[in-house]
């Protein structure tokens, strides 16, 4: 299951994404959910750091790029919240566990449960079957997609945020911790859209200038009829090419759509852009996947 067949590899190269149902067991998914429950129960976020996560461009710049809480989260475990969950003083308007959009961006490095999933033999075998020589883990996120108001993620390419030279060196690994359905906000892809380069980049502003990030280029209008929904069952793994266009809709159902996702970069012969918002640090250089 972890080693891709020639036909699976061909489909991934053709479409820019690939679904592998049953990659993780129900027990592994439960272990992640239980651990996240413990992390959330211990959550202590200062008022000035209660950053609402948004996927619309201007709101991204205001809510993320202008705050050091986001820009310095690459080597930490931090909390990002849905829109409208705080009053004007930063107090929760909904139960805290229902307010979180995601936790990022270093669960893979600092938490034993997520570290073991990320570096599992299955994941390493999968990476080897993709031909990755020296993959490193650049970031990880636990995404909640809360019931009733889990925010939409507008069409984008991961390489807009995680840019490399040459392109084609970033791979998203998206694991369904719960069933992802049409109703609760499954992923949608434009098959084959990974072959046209990157139309937009989010770059970190020079030190001392504001805001913290800005966008170069713009996201072109996408033909909605080209998007294909990708509902999957709990335990499925979705491989996501760094340049494939994908999105997810708002979750208006009464069930969450939790997922654990991390990004790999082929480090051999690759330059990680110094303009990316996310940078390796002395405390956490990008860890090697193969252990």
Swiss-Prot record:
SUPFAM superfamilies: Clavaminate synthase-like. This is Phytanoyl-CoA dioxygenase domain-containing protein 1. Fe cation binds at residues 156, 158, 246. Its EC number is 1.14.11.-. It holds the Pfam family PhyH. 2-oxoglutarate(2OG)-dependent dioxygenase that catalyzes the conversion of 2-oxoglutarate to succinate and CO(2) in an iron-dependent manner. However, does not couple 2OG turnover to the hydroxylation of acyl-coenzyme A derivatives, implying that it is not directly involved in phytanoyl coenzyme-A metabolism. Does not show detectable activity towards fatty acid CoA thioesters. The gene is PHYHD1. PANTHER family: PHYTANOYL-COA DIOXYGENASE DOMAIN CONTAINING 1, PHYTANOYL-COA DIOXYGENASE DOMAIN-CONTAINING PROTEIN 1. Keywords: Dioxygenase, Iron, Metal-binding, Oxidoreductase, Phosphoprotein. Gene3D superfamilies: q2cbj1_9rhob like domain (2.60.120.620). 2-oxoglutarate binds at residues 102, 141, 156-158, 174, 248, 257. Disulfide bonds: none annotated.
